């Protein structure tokens, strides 16, 4: 009487929130790099004084990097088609991108209360 044991291993993606949390940490720790126009190309770390510049080691494979700062979406910039957030409607109770604390970029916001009377065609 022989017995057989089977072991199966697999990889599974984490929950979506965990992926988002990890990406946020990487985004917050991203490093600016400059593209080199030399033989072999490559990327080097930015903001290094010219006198101290040496060939910087390449960023780690799992390091999030960027070439230029993101535009400021709070203020209008017609050159790149950003309208800004001034005079836009926001949602005080939202947890999303339309939340007033986020959308208004710390400038504060006005609360507008409206009272409407509408016909509801109700039947009693």
From Swiss-Prot:
A GO CC term assigned to this protein in UniProt: extracellular space
Location(s), subcellular: Secreted, Extracellular space, Extracellular matrix; Secreted
Short name of any one Pfam family annotated for the protein: wnt
Region spans: Disordered: 40-61
Disulfide topology: 90-105
Family: Belongs to the Wnt family.
Name of protein: Protein Wnt-3
Organism in which the protein naturally occurs: Evasterias troschelii (Mottled sea star)
